[in-house]
């Protein structure tokens, strides 16, 4: 099985989210899985069971209650978002395995830059020296998942000061540029997709 990879450029969060819902709701048993790469304008998203109290001060940034798991996170310019529209049932993948594949894909990407990163069992995502560099959340519907992982390449980090990232007060957040990697937002995209392919033993079809 192969993935169809779509580069969406910069796009507002809500239309992309609605498109993921529509894709998942209409897909058939033989619909190809897709990966969407996108950068969003500033937005805070709150998971299904997320506590609004974790948003300290939105500061005029839109807040969207979405249907992924997890608490609150920030998306904005300089952050690379990889959405995974995957038929887990067809691939015989559990949710935990998919989460692990996303985490390990980011860890593998960071290793290419000479950075040692790890996942945490108590707080999904990827961390470098205790600071979070990638957040993730999924929704499963009809045996298929959507949403995905967000990697901080070169975003402004002040927006994270206005929330408890992923529901954890005082959680440190970092980005590639603070770790000595000068990159534009979409530069790591191809390598991140390849790392995910390694984790899932798959092939890529560029769209």
Curated annotation (Swiss-Prot):
It comes from Methylococcus capsulatus (strain ATCC 33009 / NCIMB 11132 / Bath). Residues 29-204 form the BPL/LPL catalytic domain. GO terms for cellular component: cytoplasm. Disulfide bonds: none annotated. Pfam families: LplA-B_cat (PF21948). It catalyses: octanoyl-[ACP] + L-lysyl-[protein] = N(6)-octanoyl-L-lysyl-[protein] + holo-[ACP] + H(+). NCBIfam families: lipB, PRK14342.1. In the reaction, the free carboxyl group of octanoic acid is attached via an amide linkage to the epsilon-amino group of a specific lysine residue of lipoyl domains of lipoate-dependent enzymes. The keyword Cytoplasm applies. Keywords: Acyltransferase, Cytoplasm, Transferase. PROSITE patterns: BPL_LPL_CATALYTIC (PS51733), LIPB (PS01313). It is an enzyme of class 2 (transferase). Substrate binds at residues 68-75, 135-137, 148-150. This is Octanoyltransferase. One of its GO terms (molecular function) is lipoyl(octanoyl) transferase activity. Belongs to the LipB family. Pathway: Protein modification; protein lipoylation via endogenous pathway; protein N(6)-(lipoyl)lysine from octanoyl-[acyl-carrier-protein]: step 1/2. The keyword Cytoplasm applies. It comes from the Bacteria. Its EC number is 2.3.1.181. HAMAP family: LipB. The record marks 132 as: Lowers pKa of active site Cys. Catalyzes the transfer of endogenously produced octanoic acid from octanoyl-acyl-carrier-protein onto the lipoyl domains of lipoate-dependent enzymes. Lipoyl-ACP can also act as a substrate although octanoyl-ACP is likely to be the physiological substrate. One of its GO terms (biological process) is protein modification process.
């Amino acid at each position: 099985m192969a993935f169809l990879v779509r580069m969406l450029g910069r796009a507002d969060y809500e239309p992309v989210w609605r498109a993921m819902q529509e894709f998942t709701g209409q897909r058939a048993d033989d619909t190809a899985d897709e990966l969407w790469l996108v950068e969003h304008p500033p937005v805070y998203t709150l998971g299904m069971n997320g506590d609004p109290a974790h948003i300290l001060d939105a500061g005029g940034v839109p807040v969207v209650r979405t249907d992924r798991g997890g608490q609150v996170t920030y998306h904005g310019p300089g952050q690379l978002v990889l959405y995974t529209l995957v038929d887990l049932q067809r691939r015989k993948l559990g949710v935990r395995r998919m989460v692990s594949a996303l985490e390990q894909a980011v860890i593998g990407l960071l290793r290419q830059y000479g950075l040692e990163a790890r996942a945490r069992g108590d707080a999904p995502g990827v961390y470098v020296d205790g600071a979070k560099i990638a957040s993730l959340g999924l929704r499963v519907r009809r045996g298929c998942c959507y949403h995905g992982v967000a990697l901080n390449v070169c975003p402004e980090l002040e927006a994270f000061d206005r929330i408890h990232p992923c529901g954890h007060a005082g959680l440190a957040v970092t980005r590639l540029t603070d770790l000595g990697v000068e990159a534009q937002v979409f530069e790591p995209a191809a390598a991140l997709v390849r790392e995910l392919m390694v984790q899932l033993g798959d092939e890529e079809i560029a769209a």
